[in-house]
Amino acid sequence: MQLPSIAATTIGSFPRPSWLAQNERSRAVFRLEGAALKEAQDDATALSIHTQERIGLDLLSDGEQRRTGFINHILAAFEGIDLEHEVVKTIYRRREQPRPVPRVVGKIKRRAPAIVEDLRFAKAQTNKPIKMDVPGPMTVIDSTLDEFYKDEVAMAMDGSCMDVPQ
């Protein structure tokens, strides 16, 4: 599908419905668990996509309805990252109060595709093109505390981090 020269789109994130999550600063706290949460996330994703179609966007996103924040949903697919025992860090790009971040505790290695199923579900909701937002190496570095590599360049350039399926 050919996009117009200037495509109307959204940054990716879309407001989560109050029945799905309570939003606290830049994090969502989901109201459900297990199968009920997945069903609610599917519903919220479909709602987000259909709303984007209705308002006339050309390039749609899944609305990031499955994410508690920008990086944790993606990082859950990698070994070497502790999402359970966060530590407080001042995040440079946000220039704000210190906040809890995941810890890098070992070699980062992809154990499973991070967003393939999310993309498949989103694509099944529309005939329009879908984009998926993923954090790059610098966002991951800034949004985690490195307790393993001790070197931001080494962490960013680790080949196993770039093990992305083609």
Regions found by a protein language model. Give the residues of each.
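Domain-level signal for soluble alpha/beta catalytic cores
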Residues: 1-166
